[in-house]
Protein backbone atom coordinates (compact mmCIF):
# COMPACT_ATOMS: atom_id res chain seq x y z
CA UNK A 1 0.00 0.00 0.00
CA UNK A 2 1.49 3.40 -1.01
CA UNK A 3 2.05 5.98 1.74
CA UNK A 4 -0.51 8.73 2.17
CA UNK A 5 0.26 12.19 0.88
CA UNK A 6 1.43 13.44 -2.47
CA UNK A 7 2.25 10.82 -5.08
CA UNK A 8 3.90 13.06 -7.69
CA UNK A 9 4.95 16.57 -8.42
CA UNK A 10 2.26 19.23 -8.30
CA UNK A 11 0.95 20.44 -11.64
CA UNK A 12 2.29 23.85 -12.56
CA UNK A 13 -0.45 26.31 -13.47
CA UNK A 14 0.61 28.96 -15.94
CA UNK A 15 -1.41 32.17 -16.03
CA UNK A 16 -2.43 33.51 -19.40
CA UNK A 17 -0.23 36.41 -20.36
CA UNK A 18 -1.95 39.63 -21.35
CA UNK A 19 -1.44 40.28 -25.03
CA UNK A 20 -1.41 43.91 -26.08
CA UNK A 21 -3.01 43.97 -29.53
CA UNK A 22 -4.66 47.15 -30.80
CA UNK A 23 -5.92 45.89 -34.18
CA UNK A 24 -7.38 42.50 -35.06
CA UNK A 25 -10.00 40.44 -36.87
CA UNK A 26 -13.48 39.46 -35.68
CA UNK A 27 -14.74 36.24 -37.25
CA UNK A 28 -18.51 35.73 -36.90
CA UNK A 29 -19.78 32.28 -37.87
CA UNK A 30 -23.56 32.38 -37.89
CA UNK A 31 -25.33 29.09 -38.57
CA UNK A 32 -29.02 28.25 -38.31
CA UNK A 33 -28.42 26.76 -34.84
CA UNK A 34 -25.70 28.88 -33.19
CA UNK A 35 -23.44 31.93 -33.54
CA UNK A 36 -19.70 31.81 -32.78
CA UNK A 37 -17.61 34.99 -32.47
CA UNK A 38 -13.80 34.69 -32.47
CA UNK A 39 -11.56 37.74 -32.15
CA UNK A 40 -8.00 37.19 -33.37
CA UNK A 41 -4.84 39.18 -33.90
CA UNK A 42 -3.87 39.95 -37.54
CA UNK A 43 -1.89 36.69 -37.84
CA UNK A 44 -4.89 34.58 -36.76
CA UNK A 45 -4.07 33.72 -33.13
CA UNK A 46 -7.31 33.71 -31.10
CA UNK A 47 -7.44 36.35 -28.37
CA UNK A 48 -11.03 35.80 -27.24
CA UNK A 49 -14.07 33.86 -28.36
CA UNK A 50 -17.68 33.34 -27.35
CA UNK A 51 -20.71 31.52 -28.68
CA UNK A 52 -24.40 31.64 -27.94
CA UNK A 53 -24.12 28.34 -26.07
CA UNK A 54 -21.05 29.53 -24.16
CA UNK A 55 -22.93 32.63 -22.97
CA UNK A 56 -25.69 30.47 -21.50
CA UNK A 57 -28.36 29.89 -24.15
CA UNK A 58 -29.58 26.37 -24.84
CA UNK A 59 -31.55 24.70 -27.59
CA UNK A 60 -33.45 26.81 -30.09
CA UNK A 61 -32.67 30.03 -28.17
CA UNK A 62 -29.04 29.81 -29.37
CA UNK A 63 -30.17 30.68 -32.90
CA UNK A 64 -31.78 34.01 -31.95
CA UNK A 65 -30.28 37.41 -32.79
CA UNK A 66 -30.25 38.31 -29.08
CA UNK A 67 -28.02 35.32 -28.31
CA UNK A 68 -25.64 36.44 -31.07
CA UNK A 69 -25.60 39.94 -29.56
CA UNK A 70 -24.69 38.59 -26.11
CA UNK A 71 -21.95 36.36 -27.57
CA UNK A 72 -20.40 39.26 -29.51
CA UNK A 73 -20.49 41.51 -26.43
CA UNK A 74 -18.78 38.85 -24.32
CA UNK A 75 -16.01 38.27 -26.88
CA UNK A 76 -15.51 42.02 -27.42
CA UNK A 77 -15.23 42.75 -23.69
CA UNK A 78 -12.59 40.06 -23.26
CA UNK A 79 -10.68 41.34 -26.31
CA UNK A 80 -10.72 44.89 -24.95
CA UNK A 81 -9.00 43.60 -21.81
CA UNK A 82 -6.10 42.68 -24.11
CA UNK A 83 -6.00 46.20 -25.57
CA UNK A 84 -8.08 45.61 -28.72
CA UNK A 85 -9.53 48.82 -30.17
CA UNK A 86 -10.16 48.23 -33.89
CA UNK A 87 -11.37 45.12 -35.74
CA UNK A 88 -12.04 44.04 -39.30
CA UNK A 89 -15.14 41.82 -39.40
CA UNK A 90 -15.42 38.60 -41.41
CA UNK A 91 -18.94 37.13 -41.50
CA UNK A 92 -19.60 33.53 -42.49
CA UNK A 93 -22.87 31.64 -42.72
CA UNK A 94 -26.60 32.20 -43.32
CA UNK A 95 -27.78 32.58 -39.71
CA UNK A 96 -30.00 35.19 -38.12
CA UNK A 97 -27.36 36.70 -35.83
CA UNK A 98 -25.07 38.26 -38.42
CA UNK A 99 -26.10 41.92 -38.28
CA UNK A 100 -26.82 42.03 -34.55
CA UNK A 101 -23.37 40.61 -33.76
CA UNK A 102 -21.71 43.34 -35.83
CA UNK A 103 -23.84 46.04 -34.18
CA UNK A 104 -23.01 44.80 -30.69
CA UNK A 105 -19.27 44.80 -31.51
CA UNK A 106 -19.64 48.50 -32.34
CA UNK A 107 -21.78 49.14 -29.25
CA UNK A 108 -19.16 47.71 -26.88
CA UNK A 109 -16.61 50.24 -28.12
CA UNK A 110 -14.67 48.38 -30.81
CA UNK A 111 -14.14 50.39 -33.99
CA UNK A 112 -15.22 48.34 -37.03
CA UNK A 113 -12.89 48.99 -39.96
CA UNK A 114 -14.30 46.77 -42.70
CA UNK A 115 -16.97 44.08 -43.06
CA UNK A 116 -16.46 41.15 -45.45
CA UNK A 117 -18.75 38.24 -46.23
CA UNK A 118 -16.65 35.08 -46.48
CA UNK A 119 -19.51 32.56 -46.69
CA UNK A 120 -18.26 29.53 -48.63
CA UNK A 121 -20.33 28.88 -51.76
CA UNK A 122 -19.74 25.75 -53.85
CA UNK A 123 -19.14 26.01 -57.58
CA UNK A 124 -21.38 22.93 -57.92
CA UNK A 125 -19.15 20.73 -55.78
CA UNK A 126 -20.61 18.09 -53.48
CA UNK A 127 -24.14 16.75 -53.85
CA UNK A 128 -26.36 18.28 -51.14
CA UNK A 129 -28.30 16.07 -48.71
CA UNK A 130 -31.80 14.98 -49.65
CA UNK A 131 -34.69 17.38 -49.01
CA UNK A 132 -36.46 17.13 -45.65
CA UNK A 133 -40.11 16.10 -45.75
CA UNK A 134 -41.79 17.38 -42.60
Swiss-Prot record:
Disulphide bridges, residue numbers: none
Keyword annotations of the record: Ribonucleoprotein, Ribosomal protein, RNA-binding, rRNA-binding
SUPFAM superfamilies, A to Z: Translational machinery components
Keyword Ribonucleoprotein annotated: yes
Composition bias, Basic residues: 9-22
Residue ranges, annotated region (Disordered): 1-22, 114-134
Subunit structure: Part of the 30S ribosomal subunit. Interacts with proteins S7 and S18. Binds to IF-3.
Function: Located on the platform of the 30S subunit, it bridges several disparate RNA helices of the 16S rRNA. Forms part of the Shine-Dalgarno cleft in the 70S ribosome.
Listed name of the protein: Small ribosomal subunit protein uS11
Amino acid sequence: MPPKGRQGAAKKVRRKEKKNVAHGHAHIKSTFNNTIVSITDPTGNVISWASAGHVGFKGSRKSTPFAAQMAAESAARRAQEHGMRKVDVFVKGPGSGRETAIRSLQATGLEVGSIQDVTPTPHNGCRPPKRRRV
